[in-house]
Amino acid sequence: VDTEAYKQLRRVEDNHWWYRAAREQAGRLIDRFWPSRPRPTRVLDAGCGTGGTTAWLARYGSVIGIDPHPDALLATSARGVPVVRASADALPFRDGSFDLVTSLDVIYHARVQSPQASLREMRRVTRAGGRLLLRVPALPILEGPHDRFVHGVRRFRLGELRRELRLAGWRAGWAGYVNALLFLPTLIARRLLPSSAGGDLDRTARFGSVFLGMQQLETRLLGRVPLPIGTSLLALMENPPHPGSPE
């Protein structure tokens, strides 16, 4: 992600319908599938961007953000969130340092050479019994100009994501498509409408109340009704005990 993309993200992240809905989805998944989580929770946001979601995660406990880009770190630290310059595939923390690691729309970036290596590294710094909250863009058919604007180079099918998580050692969780109601509008827009040099965030803002309502409707069903398609994949996975570690 370059400086222009970070500027746009910082400008819209707090109130844009996409990020508001994404935070609601994340909260729903955590509350539904991890009610017994530690309180407070030690949280690492691996790929914090400009910090809107990182600051939101502080409701669960103490949170630290990491990102390799100076613009991201500056924006996140301005929110009062501790930050460290690092990449998801080389985290400067001891084994088992966190109860929850979040990585939201990160491992699809060009900067991430191996999603599986990053998922393994996130598992290393998560305590046994801790969780990973992961979101990635879904379905290669939806690839479009916005992906290129944010330097996204991969989209995942559900089976592919489950395989990556399994091979990285994550177990016993929930993973599935989200934003099914956005699938057709997104496909049509990316196939028929002229490309936007600044990605999708600005040009979809005018429909914010409609799209937010669509996503909030789906959020009520999250974890109850499996969706066959969606524009994103969301997962909450458990880190099983490492060999030789206590249960």
Predicted segments, located by residue:
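A C-terminal cap/extension of S-adenosyl-L-methionine-dependent methyltransferases
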Residues: 182-247
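Short catalytic micro-motifs in class I SAM-dependent methyltransferases
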Residues: 105-109
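Short, glycine-/aromatic-enriched active-site segment of Class I SAM-dependent methyltransferases
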Residues: 132-154, 160-163
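A short glycine-rich, Lys/Arg-flanked "PGG" loop and its adjoining helix->strand segment in the class I
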Residues: 116-131
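Conserved S-adenosyl-L-methionine
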Residues: 170-180
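Short N-terminal helix/helix-N-cap motif within the alpha/beta-hydrolase-1
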Residues: 55, 111-115, 144
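Conserved N-terminal segment of class I S-adenosyl-L-methionine
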Residues: 1-94, 100-104, 119, 230-233
